[in-house]
Amino acid sequence: MTDGDYDYLIKLLALGDSGVGKTTFLYRYTDNKFNPKFITTVGIDFREKRVAYNTQGPNGPTGKAFKVHLQLWDTAGQERFRSLTTAFFRDAMGFLLMFDLTSQQSFLNVRNWMSQLQANAYCENPDIVLIGNKADLPDQREVNERQARDLAEKYSIPYFETSAATGQNVEKAVETLLDLIMKRMEQCVEKTHIPDTVNGSSSGKLDGEKSAEKKCAC
């Protein structure tokens, strides 16, 4: 896909305490590589990836495919950057809420992140995936799977245990979030009769996307 050659621009925001592995997770997803030497994110950064999304009907794929440009925003987990992070909440259409399986404190802080997310996101029930990262370190694990799944069930969101080091469930977690977002947008399109693809110039596409996003964000 060339620049501007896409049907939808989707912005995802990675949230969680500093050190849970947000940067390495996103790097694994976009580049399929692992770099354990990333320094702590200062402020906010983002990565990009183009993907093809195939719509799913009750009996499987419908054959309709969309070209999606993903912007994956990587936020700083430190308290001093919290106000900067929350400023990006309203622009994001989905959230990767992450904790470190080897840190009980990062798991306990998920509730704080969820409170901030619910207070600042584009709608009351945004699309979220809960991620327990660093699944490749079982000997250092402090959070058991049942704990995490119970929390995910409380918030009615999917849960994945991932590893940026091995790639375990990284793509699956992002694809699940994208699927939730696209289905929400499809429902909004059906209700408002907005064309589900916008042809013409790239600026026309963005106008169409913003219109769909605004109507879906309620």
UniProtKB/Swiss-Prot annotation:
Species in which this protein is naturally found: Bos taurus (Bovine)
Enzyme nomenclature, EC number: 3.6.5.2
Name the record gives this protein: Ras-related protein Rab-27B
Regulation: Regulated by guanine nucleotide exchange factors (GEFs) which promote the exchange of bound GDP for free GTP, GTPase activating proteins (GAPs) which increase the GTP hydrolysis activity, and GDP dissociation inhibitors which inhibit the dissociation of the nucleotide from the GTPase. Activated by GEFs such as DENND10.
Top-level enzyme category: hydrolase
Ranges of compositional bias, category Basic and acidic residues: 206-218
Annotated localization: Membrane; Late endosome
Catalyzed chemical reaction(s): GTP + H2O = GDP + phosphate + H(+)
GO CC, any one term: Golgi apparatus
Gene Ontology biological-process annotations: anterograde axonal protein transport; exocytosis; positive regulation of exocytosis
Post-translational modification Cysteine methyl ester, affected residues: 218
Lipid-substituted positions (S-geranylgeranyl cysteine): 216, 218
Family: Belongs to the small GTPase superfamily. Rab family.
Domain of life: Eukaryota
Residues at which GTP binds: 16-24, 74-78, 133-136, 163-165
Function: Small GTPase which cycles between active GTP-bound and inactive GDP-bound states. In its active state, binds to a variety of effector proteins to regulate homeostasis of late endocytic pathway, including endosomal positioning, maturation and secretion. Plays a role in NTRK2/TRKB axonal anterograde transport by facilitating the association of NTRK2/TRKB with KLC1. May be involved in targeting uroplakins to urothelial apical membranes.
Keyword annotations: Acetylation, Disulfide bond, Endosome, GTP-binding, Hydrolase, Lipoprotein, Membrane, Methylation, Nucleotide-binding, Prenylation
Native organism taxonomy: Eukaryota, Metazoa, Chordata, Craniata, Vertebrata
Record's subunit section: Interacts with SYTL2, SYTL4, MYRIP and MLPH. Interacts with RPH3A and RPH3A. Interacts (GDP-bound form preferentially) with DENND10.
Tissue: Expressed at an extraordinary high level (0.1% of total protein) in urothelium.
Modified residues (N-acetylthreonine): 2
